[in-house]
Amino acid sequence: MSPKTETKASVGFKAGVKDYRLTYYTPEYQTKDTDILAAFRVTPQPGVPPEEAGAAVAAESSTGTWTTVWTDGLTSLDRYKGRCYDIEPVPGEENQYIVYVAYPLDLFEEGSVTNLFTSIVGNVFGFKALRALRLEDLRIPPAYSKTFQGPPHGIQVERDKLNKYGRPLLGCTIKPKLGLSAKNYGRAVYECLRGGLDFTKDDENVNSQPFMRWRDRFCFCAEALFKAQAETGEIKGHYLNATAGTCEEMMKRAVFARELGVPIVMHDYLTGGFTANTSLAHYCRDNGLLLHIHRAMHAVIDRQKNHGMHFRVLAKALRMSGGDHIHAGTVVGKLEGEREVTLGFVDLLRDDFIEKDRSRGIYFTQDWVSMPGVIPVASGGIHVWHMPALTEIFGDDSVLQFGGGTLGHPWGNAPGAVANRVALEACVEARNEGRDLAREGNEVIREASKWSPELAAACEVWKEIIFEFETIDTL
């Protein structure tokens, strides 16, 4: 041991346990442009002061452990430690606080969501001194976001590939989600695309099961979309789910999709994992494939208000890891999603620069610089009567995806697709004429149904179907 090292390691070291706040609570700290900033919702155990709880989060998600260690003297804690720099009580909640933590950029591997999350949402979430812990938001500095490729292509490139502008895109998840043979599955794909949809989709749990192996499904779906393209003169796509049990198998499926000449593949990014997702996103950019992302398992992580991680963080992570579409709730359908909160993370997916706005749950200003945007997908319990609201809420840069709302049409799959396309075109035309879809939406649909029997039949079937439940994901 050199004299210099010996002195650094031994001078000032005192074994034992001391409060986290003595080292990691630094309210005087001025955050840097290069810091990664986190907003945690912290519920301390009884008797634990908020300063100690906040400092514990900063410590256990960065350089700290439960006791002092002599190896602290071999490095510069001031350079590498996370810092709890602000604490504010949550209005209306007893013993709950928003804790702000700043992390030095050098704590994280470049271009790795996996490494970022392993630290910030790792073991600290099981820390006994906390009753509950939720990550509400992250500020990703450009110095870090620029180390990621991001989405394979982005919104503008996708529109150019599809030659479709000025309206939301239409999709449909093939149902029943499990049990169809590959040929019957392909038939449903063809009928929906021929009827006017832009995309059809594998359900998230369709991988390669005994009733339908992946290669058979890929072949029949490719045949269906090329036939529909020839008949309609429009570019069509089917989200071929490449998710698999190993990264090697996932990549093999993506390669086969490219060889078939289809425009888009799909991945379940949370169950598949960020490492696999980032690898697939890089392949998709290099080989001209669009990448649709499903968020299966997200509600396990994000639905509880006081513990876990808000979906806006998962959305930011996906934009960095890579995806051209991601499911983002509907506001009006069967799945969870409060309007202002949903639109907050929709903006975080699509826009280049998003201002801090606590009324929408956005804790930090986020500058994505030149990273491409992600198209939000509205899917889950929606039908033709929802079309005006969806068009008004999500705007043109979105995918509106009707599964049961297409395949449940009383006349069949193709008429279901026709009904949705007519409803969408009517809403876009009405909006472009200056009509208020929020107030006049039902009238727009009724007018369009007079000259579309397919839409009229859909309107009759679903005229009383609503999903009225109290939203859990509120501010």
Curated annotation (Swiss-Prot):
Note describing how the cofactor binds = Binds 1 Mg(2+) ion per subunit.
Keyword Plastid recorded = yes
Q: Which residues does the annotation list for site: Transition state stabilizer?
A: 334
N6,N6,N6-trimethyllysine modification sites are 14
**EC identifiers of the protein:** 4.1.1.39
Positions bound to Mg(2+): 201, 203-204
Q: Report the residues modified as N-acetylproline.
A: 3
Plastid: present as a keyword of the record? yes
- Proregion span(s): 1-2
For this UniProt record, the keywords arranged alphabetically read as follows: Acetylation, Calvin cycle, Carbon dioxide fixation, Chloroplast, Disulfide bond, Lyase, Magnesium, Metal-binding, Methylation, Monooxygenase, Oxidoreductase, Photorespiration, Photosynthesis, Plastid
How is this protein annotated for GO cellular component? chloroplast
Show the Pfam families listed in the entry.
RuBisCO_large (PF00016), RuBisCO_large_N (PF02788)
Tell me the NCBIfam families matching this sequence.
PRK04208.1 (NF003252)
Q: So what does this one do?
A: RuBisCO catalyzes two reactions: the carboxylation of D-ribulose 1,5-bisphosphate, the primary event in carbon dioxide fixation, as well as the oxidative fragmentation of the pentose substrate in the photorespiration process. Both reactions occur simultaneously and in competition at the same active site.
The UniProt similarity line reads: Belongs to the RuBisCO large chain family. Type I subfamily.
State the protein's name. Ribulose bisphosphate carboxylase large chain
Q: What species is given as this protein's source? A: Afrocarpus gracilior (African fern pine)
